[in-house]
Swiss-Prot record:
GO cellular component assignments: ribonucleoprotein complex; ribosome
Keyword ATP-binding attributed: no
PROSITE patterns: RIBOSOMAL_L5 (PS00358)
HAMAP family reported in the protein's UniProt record: Ribosomal_uL5_B (MF_01333_B)
Family: Belongs to the universal ribosomal protein uL5 family.
InterPro entries the record matches: Ribosomal_uL5, Ribosomal_uL5_bac-type, Ribosomal_uL5_C, Ribosomal_uL5_CS, Ribosomal_uL5_dom_sf, Ribosomal_uL5_N
GO molecular function, one term: structural constituent of ribosome
Top-level taxon of origin: Bacteria
Keywords, sorted A to Z: Ribonucleoprotein, Ribosomal protein, RNA-binding, rRNA-binding, tRNA-binding
Protein name: Large ribosomal subunit protein uL5
Claim: RNA-binding is one of the keywords in the record: yes
Subunit relationships: Part of the 50S ribosomal subunit; part of the 5S rRNA/L5/L18/L25 subcomplex. Contacts the 5S rRNA and the P site tRNA. Forms a bridge to the 30S subunit in the 70S ribosome.
Function: This is one of the proteins that bind and probably mediate the attachment of the 5S RNA into the large ribosomal subunit, where it forms part of the central protuberance. In the 70S ribosome it contacts protein S13 of the 30S subunit (bridge B1b), connecting the 2 subunits; this bridge is implicated in subunit movement. Contacts the P site tRNA; the 5S rRNA and some of its associated proteins might help stabilize positioning of ribosome-bound tRNAs.
Annotated gene: rplE
Length: 180
């Protein structure tokens, strides 16, 4: 079964973007390459169980086992030593990526309190979009009763677009609710 969002991309977004930016070929149309979810767990330095719980929640949200990230450098101010596990990340591609994006846009983001759309300033100049989520409770897979601590996560949507404008149009076409 093809994903709803992927069908929408092929049938609606590609023709609309081709018309707007005059691409010579369908392959030139920007597409979503991957989505990276990152959860930095700063208090994992003192308590390793926190990282396990964060990784388990990230696995529930993404449907994929997260990679444990380790500190690159030692920072005395943060009581951090090189090689200590301090976070978890997941890279989603293909079907899972479209499923996650669909779920994020249609279910999770509307559950954010006082939500007025995602900021339009979070593009990096290369066509990628970064979004910070303050609490993991907006995702339907997370059971409210099982949560010991509210954790946020970063969501980076990497596209093949060359400019922010192309990327914005692509994400808008896929249903991303940008703030007016």
């Amino acid at each position: 079964m093809a994903n709803r969002l992927k069908e929408k991309y092929t049938n609606e977004v590609v023709p609309a973007l081709t018309e707007k930016f005059n691409y010579s070929s369908v392959m030139a149309v920007p597409k979503v390459e991957k989505i990276v979810l990152n959860m930095g767990v700063g208090d994992a330095v003192s308590n390793a169980k926190n990282l396990e719980k964060a990784a388990a929640e990230l696995a529930l949200i993404s449907g994929q086992k997260p990679l444990i990230t380790k500190a690159k450098k030692s920072i005395a101010g943060f009581r951090l030593r090189e090689g200590v596990a301090i976070g978890a990340k997941v890279t989603l591609r293909g079907e899972r990526m479209y499923e996650f994006l669909d779920k994020l846009v249609s279910v999770s983001l509307p559950r954010v309190r006082d939500f007025h759309g995602v900021p339009t300033k979070s593009f990096d100049g290369r066509g990628n979009y970064t979004l910070g989520v303050k609490e993991q409770l907006i995702f339907p897979e997370i059971n409210f009763d099982d949560v010991d601590k509210v954790r946020g996560l970063d969501i980076v949507i990497v596209t093949t677009a060359n400019t922010d404008e192309e990327s914005r149009e692509l994400l808008k076409g896929l249903g991303m609710p940008f703030a007016k």
